[in-house]
């Protein structure tokens, strides 16, 4: 489930209380009911006291929050951005998502980017323009550490898949060589990778495997067990 338009920690705390009561009422395992938070108000990013409220929202969820979603258009409108400039790549959007990213780091909470309302519909030129825009925005999100994003139209699914597959395949050979060298099963490379970078490289490969962009046969001396170990 998704909790939208959050403006106060108390709203998250209230949902936690309700879910706990539902688990007791229906004899469910404690903590099994979880939720995602839609970050679509300025108040969910910056509290009146100047603190990053989104970080407090995560901790107020008592481990029930699984993801943060950026809400492109509600957030932009609340910041006073006129319609023609409301976008996933507006500076206000990037600021909000950067705060979300730092707040979620190390918590296990996933991140999801927002959507574009420019749809691939109409004549051939408009469809192709919509696809080009969407593919570029998906690539941009992935480059910035947002592995998921919202789509508003079935016509955006082809570019979602294509951009995601291309992202995880791009540079795969170099990534595999670096991981093999770090794990001690391959030749040394020109990179001096530290544990945190190796974990990020392994995470990228695992995500590529899980979405179908990469086959295990392409990993050479690196196996899933090694990836899991390095990813931690």
Positions of the model-derived regions?
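Expand to "…catalyze enediolate/carbanion chemistry for C-C bond making/breaking, isomerization
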Residues: 2-232
């Amino acid at each position: 489930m998704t909790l939208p338009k959050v403006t106060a920690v108390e709203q998250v705390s209230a949902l936690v209380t309700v879910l706990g009561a539902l688990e007791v009422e229906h004899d469910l395992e404690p903590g099994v009911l979880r939720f995602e938070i839609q970050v679509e108000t300025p108040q969910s990013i910056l509290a009146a006291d100047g603190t990053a409220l989104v970080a407090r929202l995560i901790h107020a969820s008592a481990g029930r929050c699984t993801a943060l979603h950026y809400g492109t258009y509600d957030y932009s409108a609340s910041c006073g951005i006129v319609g023609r400039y409301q976008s996933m790549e507006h500076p206000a959007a990037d600021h909000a998502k950067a705060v979300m990213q730092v707040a979620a780091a190390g918590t296990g909470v996933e991140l999801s980017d927002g959507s574009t309302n420019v749809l691939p519909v109409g004549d051939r030129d408009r469809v192709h323009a919509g696809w080009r825009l969407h593919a570029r925005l998906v690539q941009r999100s992935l480059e910035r550490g947002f592995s998921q994003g919202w789509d508003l139209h079935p016509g955006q699914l082809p570019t979602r898949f294509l951009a995601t597959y291309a992202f995880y395949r791009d540079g795969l050979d170099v990534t595999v060589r670096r991981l093999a060298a770090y794990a001690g099963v391959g030749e040394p490379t020109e990179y001096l990778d530290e544990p945190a970078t190796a974990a990020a490289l392994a995470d990228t490969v695992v995500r590529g495997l899980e979405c179908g962009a990469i086959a295990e046969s392409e990993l050479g001396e690196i196996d899933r067990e090694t990836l899991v170990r390095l990813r931690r």
